[in-house]
Amino acid sequence: MLLVIDVGNTNTVMGVFDDQRVVCDWRIRTERETTEDEFFVLASQLFAGKDIKPEIITATIVSCVVPPMRKILHAFCKKYLGHEPIWVSAEMDMGMPILYDNPAEVGADRIVNAVAAYERYHDALIVIDFGTATTFDCISKDGEYLGGAISPGVGIASEALFARASKLPRVEIFNPPAQAIGKDTAKSMQSGIILGYAGLVDGLVRRIVKEMENKPRVIATGGLAPLMANVAETIEEVESGLTLEGLRIIFDRVSNS
């Protein structure tokens, strides 16, 4: 079986594939100060909950945007799984040209999402990933990674507001307001955070569309994708398992090359 790991700044998502079928997946907090032994203890508990024995995992592929986690996961794989992990990078031959001025700058998670999305749709695309940062990644109709945009995530933006505006309360950001005009402070903040962020998404997507040769399909992934798809006018599809599927696709391509 194949273990796929996507390490983000806030959360780490893991999944186990049996051929092309995802058997199970988990979302855990990214702990930069952990050790390979502590990671194994946590992973073992997750595996046991799904009756997965570590010895049946024969390969691991990782996308990671948190440099300290590379050493930890490399040691975990070697010590407890008996193999070295494959690390996703722009230098790999994944069947997708990276048309960035410096391809090495492209985050592994952005590449993974782009590969998975194009494999699924085979069309011009904008992939929006709502994570710690919100990334907009553009793929041409011919399957080229064109570049994109990066903005602060919804969580970062709201936390900055809570921290810097001492008289404003901390509000729930996972429930969109019924209207833009808030009738109290909490609803006004929800409007500004959620509907305001939807405006950011729609405005940026419309600008990007004007620069692309073919009209793209707009898809969203990440933890807040379902919420934002309900309030942003330009999002057409939500693909919650995009990153894990992309890791599986890249592993297959690299293994068969």
Swiss-Prot record:
Cofactor note: A monovalent cation. Ammonium or potassium.
A GO molecular-function annotation: ATP binding
Root EC class: transferase
Catalysed reactions, semicolon-separated: (R)-pantothenate + ATP = (R)-4'-phosphopantothenate + ADP + H(+)
Pathway info: Cofactor biosynthesis; coenzyme A biosynthesis; CoA from (R)-pantothenate: step 1/5
Residues binding K(+): D129
Key word Metal-binding present: yes
Residues that bind ATP: D6, V7, G8, N9, T10, N11, T12, V13, T132
Active site: D109
Keywords attached to this entry: ATP-binding, Coenzyme A biosynthesis, Cytoplasm, Kinase, Metal-binding, Nucleotide-binding, Potassium, Transferase
Stored Pfam families: Pan_kinase
Keyword ATP-binding among record annotations: yes
Residues annotated for substrate binding in this entry: Y100, G107, A108, D109, R110, T185
Family the UniProt entry places it in: Belongs to the type III pantothenate kinase family.
Job of this protein: Catalyzes the phosphorylation of pantothenate (Pan), the first step in CoA biosynthesis.
Subunit details: Homodimer.
Protein name: Type III pantothenate kinase
Species whose genome carries this gene: Desulfatibacillum aliphaticivorans
